Curated annotation (Swiss-Prot):
Induction notes from the record: By zinc depletion.
Source organism superkingdom: Eukaryota
Pfam families hit by this protein: Vel1p
Name of protein: VEL1-related protein SPBPB2B2.15
Family: Belongs to the VEL1 family.
Keywords: Cytoplasm, Signal, Zinc
Record field: transmembrane: none
Keyword presence, rRNA processing: no
UniProt signal peptide: 1-16
Length: 203
């Protein structure tokens, strides 16, 4: 039992370390100013990194007043979200606007500044309220730069199915693997590139 705990600890540690990036430049960011961009899947016309959402059972079983109050408080758990890729006109899908710190151009936040996490066992990326309390979760820093420059930072970016959340929302998850890891058969490698929201028709 003790050996298993040590093994799991080192797996989690190794996974967490690869997300600690510093001194990153924004030479590939082509937003209106340094650090406002969308991540587009290379080789597609309108497929972006974004989120799909659904209303949880607890929200459906409470009164309208309680639901509205939780919505005003922007409670993340009220409407769980899946970090995924999809075409812009997909139902319940919203492309995410990534931002960076203007002075250094290092990644600062994703959309509404929620902190992304990675599952150290499945390598699935998530940033909803459940990710923080989920077992095997590890905080990510420098996520957007790794997604854009995966080969430079020795990681593989992939979309994966099946999975409970992927089946529920009919969308793949986004996972990050070390280059030396074998990718599961249910995953497909993808390449992402930053694009200016205005150039893509977003206001």
């Amino acid at each position: 039992m003790f050996k298993n705990l040590i093994f799991l600890f080192f797996i989690g540690l190794a996974t967490a370390i690869r997300f600690n990036l510093t001194d990153l430049e924004c030479s590939r960011l082509r937003g209106p100013h340094c650090g406002t961009y969308l991540l587009k899947v290379v080789g597609t016309n309108a497929t972006y990194v974004g989120e799909k959402s659904f209303i949880g059972l607890d929200a459906l079983t409470e009164s309208k007043g309680e639901f509205f109050q939780r919505m005003l408080e922007q409670e993340p758990r009220l409407i769980p979200r899946l970090f995924t890729i999809a075409e812009n006109d997909t139902a319940n899908f919203t492309p995410l606007t990534f931002t960076t710190y203007l002075k250094t151009c290092n990644p600062q936040s994703i959309e509404n500044a929620m902190i992304p996490f990675v599952n150290t066992v499945t390598s699935e990326i998530s940033f909803d309220a459940w990710a923080y309390t989920a077992q095997n979760s590890s905080r990510i820093t420098g996520l957007s730069n790794q997604l854009m420059n995966s080969t430079l930072y020795n990681v593989q970016v992939a979309t994966c199915t099946p999975g409970f959340s992927a089946l529920l929302l009919d969308s793949p998850t986004i996972n990050v693997f070390n280059n030396e890891e074998g990718m599961p058969s249910w995953c497909q490698p993808i390449e992402l590139t930053p694009v200016c929201p205005l150039d893509e028709g977003f206001n």
